[in-house]
């Protein structure tokens, strides 16, 4: 069940020629970056249409990443939500955690490094929060022999020591970012500064469906294989489509990868789950689509967490990968269009969900992913018997063991 043409044209034609998803997206960048973005856009359109690019990408996704990832029926987790009359919804996991490097991030990193190689770029930079995108980027750079610099906030480096070591082991240089809050927003800002300075030799592998055009489109397209496989696997397993797709949302790449091929299927609910952090009322959260307002960050118009003066505020989440005050512009568009729903869950709810999945299914999810599982507590009681939910199990939780132990006040 391998996808042989992961970048074929969809019927949902966004972004437009200006890189906009309705009112969102675009290119809000310094003039020095415009030629690089134009070069990247032209190269992407050119190479994605070439059969040799398609074949190389499909071959690596199969033999290097290990695709297709399974669609797994979580029997005990489903039964956990049984009602007194014995009825319950059916929960399936799209197992992106089983990919090489342990998350969905490798899909995009691999696609972009093939693009960079064809563009003649010898130096690769990236930002990372949870470290999974950094590890994926370091991995593909090792595979293709390219110089790799990863920008990572010092707070995230402390939370994700295991992934920092993995990146170093893979030959990347991890550049600590002390500015601001020392988290993903600041790492992204530093990576953009580097790119402005070294634009001739360097390709920036942005890790989410955020940033200026063409990144939201390009990253979505490289992750689209998730939804394409899900459709094929669902049709094979039960002869229909899922009733609900559920995914966590930080920048929003794993969710867009799952959602995109179902946007034109109105019977399929699309639900994204953000980080409510300590709580929404505390102000310490990363619930951008729930609580934010439109504004510009990192080159694109989208929903942002802002204060009354329009300044971007700090985000908070126990999960480094959701700790971001913005979101991809296509998610903002889907929210306003009413096509996707967005809710939030707290740190505590995510930790509890991580424990629940671990103990019921023997699968330890990433803290980011656990936010989606936490929403089952709210969602499942509302559903009819036999309704099918597909959750994007976007990453494994090895990287989060220390964070979880610290939160639970347990010694390792």
UniProtKB/Swiss-Prot annotation:
The modification N6-(pyridoxal phosphate)lysine is found at residue 105. Pathway: Amino-acid biosynthesis; L-tryptophan biosynthesis; L-tryptophan from chorismate: step 5/5. PROSITE patterns: TRP_SYNTHASE_BETA. One of its GO terms (biological process) is L-tryptophan biosynthetic process. It is an enzyme of class 4 (lyase). Its cofactor is pyridoxal 5'-phosphate. It comes from the Bacteria. It catalyses: (1S,2R)-1-C-(indol-3-yl)glycerol 3-phosphate + L-serine = D-glyceraldehyde 3-phosphate + L-tryptophan + H2O. Its EC number is 4.2.1.20. GO terms for cellular component: cytoplasm. One of its GO terms (molecular function) is tryptophan synthase activity. Keywords: Amino-acid biosynthesis, Aromatic amino acid biosynthesis, Lyase, Pyridoxal phosphate, Tryptophan biosynthesis. Pfam families: PALP. The beta subunit is responsible for the synthesis of L-tryptophan from indole and L-serine. PANTHER family: TRYPTOPHAN SYNTHASE, TRYPTOPHAN SYNTHASE-RELATED. Tetramer of two alpha and two beta chains. Belongs to the TrpB family. This is Tryptophan synthase beta chain. It comes from Synechocystis sp. (strain ATCC 27184 / PCC 6803 / Kazusa). The lineage of its organism: Bacteria, Bacillati, Cyanobacteriota, Cyanophyceae, Synechococcales. The gene is trpB.
């Amino acid at each position: 069940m391998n996808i042989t043409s992961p970048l074929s044209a969809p019927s949902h034609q966004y972004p437009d020629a200006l890189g906009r998803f309705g009112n969102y997206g675009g290119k809000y960048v310094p003039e020095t970056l415009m030629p690089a973005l134009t070069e990247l856009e032209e190269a992407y359109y050119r190479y994605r249409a070439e059969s040799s690019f398609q074949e190389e990408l499909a071959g690596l996704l199969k033999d290097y990443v290990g695709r297709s990832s399974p669609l797994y029926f979580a029997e005990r987790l489903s039964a956990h939500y049984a009602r007194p009359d014995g009825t319950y919804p059916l929960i399936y996991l799209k197992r992106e955690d089983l990919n090489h490097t342990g998350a969905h991030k490798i899909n995009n990193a691999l696609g972009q490094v093939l693009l960079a190689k064809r563009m003649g770029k010898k130096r690769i930079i990236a930002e990372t929060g949870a470290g999974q995108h950094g590890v994926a980027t370091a991995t593909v750079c090792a595979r293709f022999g390219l110089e790799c610099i990863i920008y990572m906030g010092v707070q995230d480096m402390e939370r994700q020591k295991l992934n920092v070591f993995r990146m170093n082991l893979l030959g990347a240089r991890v550049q600590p970012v002390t500015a601001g809050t020392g988290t993903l927003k600041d790492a992204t800002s530093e990576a953009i500064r580097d790119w402005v300075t070294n634009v001739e030799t360097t390709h920036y592998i942005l890790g989410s469906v955020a940033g200026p055009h063409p990144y939201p489109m390009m990253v979505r397209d490289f992750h689209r294989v998730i939804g394409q496989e899900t459709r094929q696997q669902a049709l094979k397993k039960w002869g229909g489509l899922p009733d609900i797709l559920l995914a966590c949302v930080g920048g929003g790449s794993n969710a867009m990868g799952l959602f995109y091929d179902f946007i034109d299927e109105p019977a399929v609910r699309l639900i994204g789950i953000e980080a409510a952090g300590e709580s929404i009322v505390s102000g310490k959260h990363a619930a951008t689509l729930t609580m934010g307002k439109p504004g510009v960050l990192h080159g694109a118009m989208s929903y942002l967490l802002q204060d009354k003066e329009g300044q971007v505020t700090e985000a908070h989440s126990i999960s480094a990968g959701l700790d971001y005050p913005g979101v991809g512009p296509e998610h903002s568009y889907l929210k306003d269009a009413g096509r996707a729903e967005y809710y939030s869950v707290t740190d505590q709810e995510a930790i509890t969900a991580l424990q629940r999945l671990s103990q019921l299914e023997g699968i330890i999810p990433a803290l980011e992913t656990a936010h989606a599982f936490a929403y089952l507590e709210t969602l499942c009681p509302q559903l009819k018997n036999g309704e099918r939910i597909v959750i994007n199990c976007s990453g494994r939780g090895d990287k989060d063991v220390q964070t979880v132990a610290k939160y639970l006040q347990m010694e390792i």
